[in-house]
Each structure stands twice: as structure tokens, then as C-alpha cells.
């Protein structure tokens, strides 16, 4: 579940619209676009309506959702599919957590952060996150805090084989 933002001409002026996309992958690995919705903003109510529409169209159960960091996703998913697991998109997490990292530190910080999200196991990832916090926590506390506070939805994929 994600959005693609684009400019459209409406009433002789350009405005930004979003196409909200839900891509599904079945147990055989086949990908299907389950729907595209045009809208103006994302909210829990919007995504809950989308998920309920998918249920109405025949989706009975969802094993795993991969989403960006919007809190509205989590709320809607937990309401519509309470047994589904959630994995936050690592790219979205990296972008949001490093947005205020100085250019002079970004390369070194990213090398250390990569050891967290590319670890082989959750235990290794947690150990690397502790090392990351020890090294960068005083300089970039919001970056470290973001990874710690979102760990439950950043580490979901460790439960599955690579």
C-alpha cells in the first residue's frame, strides 16, 4: 500500500493528486494490483474504507502488509485485518529517520545503519542497533529513537527465511 503523487490540470490550474495503490502477492508469488484510488489525502478513515472495499470484493485474509510510516496505515490495518502482520518499508524508514543527518556524517551513519537492517537475524540486528545507538544516539537522537520506537514493525521480516 502506497501512494504515487502527480500533477494534474484541473480548472485551468495544476494541482497535486495522489493515486493510492494496493498491490497483492498471493502464496504462489503472483502479483496483482488490487486497486488504485484517486484521492487528495491519506487518513485512517480513507485506508479503512479501502481495506473494507477489498474485503467486500473477496479478500478474506491478509498475511502481511508492507507500508510506509504513516500511522493511519497501522490503525486501518489493525481494524480491518487484526491478524495481519505489518512490515514498515525500510526505504521509507531510512528516508524519514535520516532526513536531518548532516551531509558530513551521512555516509558513515548509513554504513552503520545498514548493519541493522541487513542483519541475518533479529538478534544480530538488535545488537547492531545498540551499537548504532551508542555511536550516534547523542548526535542524532531522533534518528535512533525512530528505529527503536518502530522496531516492532521494522523487524517483522526477520521471522521469515530470506
What positions do the PLM features span?
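Structural beta-strand/beta-sheet cores of well-ordered domains, especially the beta-sheet scaffolds
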Residues: 18, 63, 87, 96, ...
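Conserved beta-strand -> loop -> alpha-helix junction used to position metal-binding or nucleic-acid-contacting
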Residues: 64-71, 76-114
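Short acidic (Asp/Glu) and glycine-rich catalytic loops that position anionic groups and cofactors
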Residues: 30, 90, 108, 152-160
Amino acid at each position: 500500500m502506497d501512494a504515487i503523487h502527480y500533477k494534474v490540470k484541473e480548472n485551468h490550474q495544476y494541482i497535486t493528486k495522489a493515486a493510492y495503490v494496493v498491490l497483492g502477492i498471493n502464496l504462489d508469488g503472483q502479483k496483482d494490483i488490487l486497486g488504485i484510488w484517486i484521492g487528495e489525502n491519506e487518513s485512517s478513515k480513507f485506508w479503512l474504507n479501502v481495506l473494507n472495499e477489498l474485503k467486500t470484493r473477496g479478500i478474506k485474509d491478509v498475511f502481511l502488509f508492507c507500508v510506509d510510516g504513516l500511522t493511519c496505515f497501522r490503525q486501518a490495518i489493525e481494524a480491518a485485518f487484526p491478524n495481519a502482520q505489518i512490515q514498515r518499508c525500510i526505504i521509507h524508514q531510512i528516508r524519514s529517520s535520516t532526513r536531518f543527518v548532516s551531509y558530513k556524517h551521512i555516509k558513515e551513519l548509513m554504513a552503520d545503519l545498514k548493519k541493522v537492517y541487513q542483519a541475518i537475524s533479529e538478534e544480530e540486528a538488535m545488537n547492531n542497533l545498540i551499537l548504532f545507538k551508542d555511536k550516534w544516539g547523542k548526535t542524532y537522537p531522533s534518528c535512533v529513537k525512530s528505529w527503536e520506537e518502530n522496531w516492532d514493525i521494522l523487524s517483522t521480516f526477520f521471522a521469515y527465511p530470506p
